[in-house]
Amino acid sequence: MQANPQLLLQLVEIQMPYGRFKGRILCDLPVSYLEWFSRKGFPKDKLGILLQTLYEIKMNGLENLLEPLKKNKGY
């Protein structure tokens, strides 16, 4: 399975639209918040797909996939 580049790019562009971390770029969400979603259920929309993807990336130690994208965005 190959990573979807568009999905990865959205992880460094889109802000969390609600909740405790509203306004934070998705890739900067803490693992504990993603674990909470994993237990309670991810949203059933595009945001849910992004959060679930980010959860898998962080749980598998693959954050380095996002580093070049973050640098291109100036973070």
Language-model segments: which ranges?
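DEDD superfamily 3′-5′ metal-dependent exonuclease/proofreading module
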Residues: 1-75
